[in-house]
Amino acid sequence: MKKSLLLFLSVVMLLSCKAQLPPGEYTSTNKKAIAAFENALTYFNQRNDEKAKKELKNAIEKDPNFIEPHLLMAQIYAENKETQLAIDEYIKTLEINPKFDKRTFFNLANLEISIGKYADAKKDYEAFLKYTTINPDWKERAEKNLANCNFAIEAIKNPVPFDPKNIGDGINSNLDEYFPAITADDQTFLFTRNNRTETINLQEDFLISKKVNGVWQKAALIGSGINTAGNEGAPNLSADGQILFFAACQEVDGSYGPNRKGYGSCDLFYAQKVGENWGKSYNVGGAVNTNMFESQPSFSSDGKSLYFVSGRLGGYGETDIYVSKLSVNGSWSAPKNLGPKINTPGKEESVFIHPDGKTLYFGSNGHVGMGGLDLYVARMNDKGEWSEPVNIGYPINTYGDENSVLVSSTGNLAYFASNRAGGLGGLDIYHFELPAAARPGIITYFKGKVYDARSKAPLGAHFELIDLETGKSVIESDANPGNGEFLVCLPIDKNYALNVSQPGYLFYSENFALKELADKSKPYLMDVPMQPIDTGSVIELKNVFFETAKFDLKPESKVELDKLVAFLTVNKTMKGELSGHTDNVGDKKMNLTLSQNRAKAVYDYLVTNGIDAKRLTYKGYGDTKPKVKNDSDANRAMNRRTEFKVVGK
């Protein structure tokens, strides 16, 4: 994990080392060696490293035990990322005189941990920490990295499975591809590509690919409405692929691209799909964006939370992870810092909230890990509290920087970018099987298609999914008006009610039990035919529930009945009949009475909640009007129902 090294051996340090000796003396008395070293200092101050190294080699040749040239040579090598050569020079210094300067152990250990030499780094950090007078900042850094060494040594002994596969040339090219985003149904893949040229080093744009027969097709630019001559990055798609969040940074002229305005530095923007095309992009707003760095958004699958990374004032470190909530009026709340369990005095970035809504993946160099930016997973409990983050393990995490992880809705696959050998060029996007311990909760996606029951024309209807156990709304949104489709992610251990409404149509209700799915790996698909409001039209109240053989309304019926109240309140002149129906099991007379009482229970609820009794009637039909034959348990269940029929508009 490459990181900025704390190399304190600047010219100032060298002079301070000299000051520890008798006045006017170096660690050498060889005049030619001293002259060569002082020439090297002059070249070093002029940033002429090659001439400085030549003079340093000359000084060392004249006196191999001359410490100062070794120290300056180590710094030059380190600054030019010739890490092993820098390490060799520090080791030579310690061989000459291990007590010359305690900082030599510190700087050597920093280099060793940066290339994964954990045992060597551990030894040198321990040697450094034995000194009693240490700069507090250096001591804190050494103690943290010593903990990293201890963690890494054990992690390497206990590796997790890791076999990354290149995602293919439909997405990857000889350029850099990174920051992947994917829809919950695994059919649309969006990512960032740096379309650099000979004259432009950074030109970031978004590309999109569709999966056909299990293969990602050749990616194409997402369109001029989003991509600009500037840079767009860190994309994130809503679960259904209808909303795109991304970051854009301020250009030299102060803009964020054509017709885009911001608050300073990098801001978050969003765009919505209109049919098959993307609409105009908009700034998320001043509640979220500041004049500091905001980037790397992750939109929760329920459409209620936006996680992102910010360098704003008041955080715990260089960059922290925040979350903002979407209010009922469509505005974003003031962001909340995720707190010290997640954020550290270091850097947190590349946040991703899984569609299960409870599992958070992110990169950090502040938690104990392999030495720099590692990938971590944290989980939210039922109280909304985050667990301690867990490092997802070696060799997924290494001494290099790891970030930008994306986890599929199924939870078994993770995507990341790497410039590892064997790719198509530059950074490529790879996927791998996520270790079981790092996987999120099991979910499936629910995909619906809303249309006019007569014409089959798609409808952009409003829909809401409700947890039947808690009565709480899980997600509320609109279907795509172009194709009538919607897609949401849902935990499989719950049962849900679906309510769909559209002006001019009867509202639609359904309930389904994901707990009872035979194959939990497959999505739940549903057609939603909407009936135009006409006399004789019928709504089956599928989310009105009674105790067995009783007419007491269950508490979970309230949501549906309130929808019916709202529907009748909007359609002020509508009149209707509430009807109860049973199957053919049991005494016919008792069934007739039961159905009558159940219809009346719904009637009473509506009247109690403000609907004029003159607009309503109720009747029980027993088993006289079955929808299907009473020849199976499933069919008998369909015949046990409560309906609302329009008898006048």
What are these regions (language model features)?
Residues S364, V368-G371, N571, E577-K649:
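Periplasmic OmpA-like peptidoglycan-binding domain that tethers envelope proteins to the cell wall
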